[in-house]
């Protein structure tokens, strides 16, 4: 098959209308706006109502991305949904396919937690580069508010809900300049949303386990240490693969986990603060949605312009982390 280039030609985003401010969280747990904002940079987060679904947020973001790419849903060959919180554990990408009317698209979910969008970007690129598909819709979406313990101030202050989407298309020149992906399962226990079940005897001498997933648990200090060390390293590796220097980067777009992490990574890479894209003050950590949501906002605000070089990195549970260097537009 012919190897082709890829371009990111459209973006979109969606978030619930309901906002929860730091001051309101102090009614739930022992905290304050100052405590949260100084440690995380977060001031509010969006929360999905019981009537809202992951697929509805994802579809809204997708419609924007498809429109901005100048194509129709019927042009989409593949839909990749990066999420850890599907409407249906068997997968939600096909539900989005139906909502969009993308009748010819293959659709499946991809789970890599907060790294999901970057892992999905690289996965989508392989389908295009090998000539299998021409138009791919990549979505990052999560509703983690449904999976946090709202009495645990270590986690409930961090997460918000949202969705972001991009369209990738085959292109004469390759706009994905370089990437690197990593995983380390030995550190899985630092951040997880683990299954917790109870043994039940269904017949004599035959036991099964039934249960559900426990809320998000996290060792914040270890996750910070991991991100501060591994994210600059993997961005450097992706830059090497792209054969460009850090000075050529127009924008640093990291997973929006914590402002301290964003600042630390930028400092270690010697990237000035004005090149760092951050919107977590308004959305919190939206997991797989954070990068495409921030990307879309920056494009719509006129910050990111055609041909800008963007260094992006996702990192989180697994533990997983990855980086991609790409140019915006064709």
Swiss-Prot record:
Subcellular location(s) of the protein: Cytoplasm
Listed EC numbers: 2.3.1.180
Keyword Membrane: no
Catalytic activity: malonyl-[ACP] + acetyl-CoA + H(+) = 3-oxobutanoyl-[ACP] + CO2 + CoA
Principal place of residence: cytoplasm
GO molecular function ontology, one term from the record: 3-oxoacyl-[acyl-carrier-protein] synthase activity
Stretches for region ACP-binding: 256-260
Record CDD domains: KAS_III
Role: Catalyzes the condensation reaction of fatty acid synthesis by the addition to an acyl acceptor of two carbons from malonyl-ACP. Catalyzes the first condensation reaction which initiates fatty acid synthesis and may therefore play a role in governing the total rate of fatty acid production. Possesses both acetoacetyl-ACP synthase and acetyl transacylase activities. Its substrate specificity determines the biosynthesis of branched-chain and/or straight-chain of fatty acids.
Domain comment, as recorded: The last Arg residue of the ACP-binding site is essential for the weak association between ACP/AcpP and FabH.
PANTHER family: 3-OXOACYL-[ACYL-CARRIER-PROTEIN] SYNTHASE, BETA-KETOACYL-[ACYL-CARRIER-PROTEIN] SYNTHASE III, CHLOROPLASTIC
Protein name: Beta-ketoacyl-[acyl-carrier-protein] synthase III
Annotated organism of origin: Trichormus variabilis (strain ATCC 29413 / PCC 7937)
Name of the coding gene: fabH
């Amino acid at each position: 098959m012919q190897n082709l280039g890829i371009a990111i030609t459209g973006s979109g985003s969606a978030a619930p209308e309901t906002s929860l401010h730091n001051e309101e969280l102090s009614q739930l747990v022992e905290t304050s706006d100052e405590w949260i904002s100084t440690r995380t940079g977060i001031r509010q987060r969006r929360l999905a109502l019981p009537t809202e679904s992951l697929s509805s947020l994802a579809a809204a973001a997708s419609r924007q991305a498809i429109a901005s790419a100048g194509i129709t849903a019927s042009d989409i060959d593949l839909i990749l949904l990066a999420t850890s919180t599907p409407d249906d554990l068997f997968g939600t990408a096909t539900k989005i396919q139906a909502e969009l009317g993308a009748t010819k698209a293959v659709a499946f979910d991809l789970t890599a937690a907060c790294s999901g969008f970057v892992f999905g970007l690289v996965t989508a690129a392989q389908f295009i580069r090998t000539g299998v598909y021409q138009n791919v819709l990549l979505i990052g979406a999560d509703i983690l508010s449904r999976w946090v313990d709202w009495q645990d101030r270590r986690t409930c202050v961090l997460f918000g809900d949202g969705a972001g989407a991009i369209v990738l298309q085959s292109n004469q020149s390759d706009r994905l300049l370089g990437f690197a992906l990593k995983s380390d399962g030995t550190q899985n226990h630092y951040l997880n949303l683990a299954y917790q079940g109870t043994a039940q005897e269904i017949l004599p001498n035959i036991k099964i386990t039934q249960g559900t997933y426990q809320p998000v648990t996290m060792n914040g200090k270890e996750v910070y240490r991991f991100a501060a060390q591994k994210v600059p390293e993997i961005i450097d590796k992706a830059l090497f693969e792209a054969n460009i220097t850090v000075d050529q980067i127009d924008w640093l777009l990291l997973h929006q986990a914590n402002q301290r992490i964003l600042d630390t990574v930028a400092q270690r890479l010697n990237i000035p603060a004005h090149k760092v894209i951050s919107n977590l003050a308004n959305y919190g950590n939206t997991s797989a949605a954070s990068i495409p949501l921030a990307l879309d906002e920056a494009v719509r605000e006129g910050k990111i312009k055609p041909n800008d070089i963007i260094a992006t990195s996702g990192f989180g549970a697994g533990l997983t982390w990855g980086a991609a260097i790409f140019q915006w537009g064709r």
